[in-house]
């Protein structure tokens, strides 16, 4: 499979006309969107995408053999051909999407009448040799073709040294796409995309190693390396206390500022807090993927944490800031680069039920990370949950590969595996014992 990764290199120069180029490109996309909306009836009759694109270009770009119907070339003279085609493609996509959503609204498939947005946030693509020329091998710079208000000229753009060192160290020799301009936090970046061909693990189920992960709020993640017979080979607690302290400090400053001045002029502080939280999620995801790779895991198993609805209660801010889905998405991308698969299991009762099968646990009121089993044993609640997550994966994979008669026989001997929301680690051990006995017989 193909895995696409990207990285943004910051542009250091402040005296090159990037803003002029960006404004001109967005104005061109706006103009093309208005044009294609007026002639969409004609363009929609063309089924082939390439022919539709060619016809759309002929409408706005004149040559010796083609007289353009609209005066786009006069409004945007000397625009590079590749940049013009990128703008045409963006405008065509916007108009096509609008009419598709409009038909769905008329048929009742979606609610709310869609609108065609002309104020776009399109970003130009700098195609190689036409609008972008890389610098020397060790040079932290590139040449960009930009619009200075009168003409299109080449400008030297200095790039941040640390960003270029990262690209040279980790992505040298990889297939890269044309860089795209990006604006973040009042700064401009060149975002490079790289495509890798990876082969995911094809190890048979019985020979697999899995890394079961319990994502938490107090402890960022707890990982367990587990075999199909239930043997736990290694465990790891992933936590970043300094990052969480920094985030807590920023949230406290926001709270005090809002008490004194209200909710106005607080956007920049919240933006900083969100960036800290995103960085915490990125570090957690990287640690999980690297730990699984170090232990030669074939699959990373998460809980399915698609929480919906309004969150209430005094802990709602913690739950809102918990980037569970972002961690899983980032980790999945990193795992695929290592050739590791990602799977998800039902999250119900993984923390509530003890891994030894003794039933519901009682949380320690002083330390929420600890719990007490009904047998009186004190244990880490997140570690117990990671065992249950791994067990649910193995129970599912073992049962679904069996013939119907053998599956029914095992479910009759181990009734707990029928209900996947209450399966625990102890049920996996019993299932493996019964499965081994049936094979021996």
Give the location of each predicted region:
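Nucleic-acid substrate recognition interfaces
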Residues: 1-441
């Amino acid at each position: 499979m193909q895995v696409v990764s990207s990285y943004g290199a910051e542009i250091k120069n402040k005296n090159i006309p990037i803003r002029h180029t960006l404004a001109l490109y967005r104005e061109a996309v706006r103009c093309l969107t208005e044009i294609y909306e007026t002639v969409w009836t004609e363009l929609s009759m063309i089924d082939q995408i390439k022919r539709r694109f060619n016809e759309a270009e002929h409408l706005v770009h004149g040559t010796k053999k083609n007289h353009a119907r609209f005066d786009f070339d006069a409004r945007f003279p000397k625009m590079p051909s590749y940049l013009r085609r990128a703008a045409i493609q963006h405008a065509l996509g916007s108009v096509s999407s609008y009419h598709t959503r409009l038909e769905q609204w008329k048929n009742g498939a979606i609610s709310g009448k869609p609108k065609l947005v002309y104020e776009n946030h399109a970003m130009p693509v700098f195609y190689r040799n036409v609008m972008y020329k890389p610098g020397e091998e060790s040079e932290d710079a590139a040449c960009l073709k930009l619009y200075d208000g009168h003409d299109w000229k080449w400008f030297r753009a200095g790039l941040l040294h640390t960003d270029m060192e990262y690209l040279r160290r980790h992505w040298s020799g990889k297939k890269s796409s044309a860089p795209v301009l990006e604006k973040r936090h009042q700064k401009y970046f060149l975002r490079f995309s790289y495509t890798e061909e990876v082969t995911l693990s094809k190890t048979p189920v019985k020979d697999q190693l899995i890394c079961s992960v319990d994502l938490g709020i107090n402890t960022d993640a707890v990982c367990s390396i587990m075999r199909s017979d239930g043997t736990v080979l290694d465990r790891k607690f992933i936590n970043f206390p300094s990052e969480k302290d920094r985030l807590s400090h920023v949230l406290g400053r926001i709270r005090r500022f809002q008490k004194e001045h209200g909710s106005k002029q607080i956007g920049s502080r919240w933006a900083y807090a969100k960036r800290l939280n995103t960085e915490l999620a990125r570090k957690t995801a990287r640690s999980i993927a690297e730990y699984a790779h170090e232990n030669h895991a074939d699959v990373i198993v998460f809980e399915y944490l698609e929480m919906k609805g309004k969150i209430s209660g005094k802990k709602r801010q913690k739950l809102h800031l918990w980037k569970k889905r972002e961690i899983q998405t980032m980790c999945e991308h990193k795992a695929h680069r290592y050739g590791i698969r990602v799977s998800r299991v039902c999250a119900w009762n993984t923390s509530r039920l003890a891994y030894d099968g003794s039933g519901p646990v009682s949380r320690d009121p002083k330390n929420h990370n600890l719990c007490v089993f009904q047998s009186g044993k004190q244990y880490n609640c997140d570690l117990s949950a990671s065992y249950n997550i791994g067990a649910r994966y193995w129970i599912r994979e073992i049962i679904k590969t069996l013939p119907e008669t053998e599956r029914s026989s095992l479910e009759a001997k181990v009734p707990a595996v029928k209900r996947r929301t209450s399966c625990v680690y102890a049920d996996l051990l019993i299932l493996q014992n019964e499965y081994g006995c049936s094979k021996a017989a």
